[in-house]
A protein has these predicted regions:
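A recurrent flexible, glycine/aromatic-enriched loop bordering the glycosyltransferase active site
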Residues: 1-23, 74-80
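Non-catalytic, C-terminal membrane-associated alpha-helical segments of glycosyltransferases
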Residues: 71-154
């Protein structure tokens, strides 16, 4: 079981209202698109959620196509491109260190983030959307006890 926040749905399981899909400009061809579309939709006043009681079997863990460490590295890069609030990203990386492969997965996330900074990768979101995302992430950090050890319901 993989944890996702209640307002995020993994890419292959997404459905959209027609008006929302039009407003967000469709599915953008960027890494982390399934997070980008959620942020833009919610910034525009749409509600987003997942349905954890609907069971779906993925054939592999998210981000593991090229191996878990490459997935962690890419996750760090996507996080930078999406404009993650740095303290939130650091907390997320530390949280990743608590899962296999222990410690090194979080280190690879940080390396991916740093590589994206140094290579000046372009942002996937506009400044207004990044501000919206960071406000959400600051709220999560302030209420971290609700999320720290949470897993989705079975």
């Amino acid at each position: 079981d993989e944890f996702v926040f209640g307002n995020h749905t993994r890419g292959g399981l997404k459905t959209y209202r027609k008006n929302c899909f039009s407003e967000i400009g469709g599915v953008l061809e960027v890494d982390g698109w399934d997070g980008v579309d959620r942020i833009i939709a919610e910034k525009n006043g749409w509600k987003s959620r997942n349905f954890p009681k609907i069971r779906v079997e993925h054939r592999r863990k998210t981000g593991s196509y090229d191996g878990v460490l490459k997935g962690c590295y890419d996750s760090g890069s996507f996080s930078y491109c999406m404009g993650y609030y740095p303290p939130f990203f650091l907390a997320r990386s530390i949280h990743r260190m608590l899962r296999k492969p222990y410690f090194i997965g979080g280190i690879f996330m940080i390396l991916g983030y740093i590589a994206a900074i140094t290579s000046r990768k372009p942002k996937s979101l506009d400044k207004e959307s990044i501000s919206f995302l960071r406000t959400e992430q600051r709220s999560i950090l302030r209420n971290w006890q609700k999320f720290a050890f949470k897993t989705n319901e079975k």
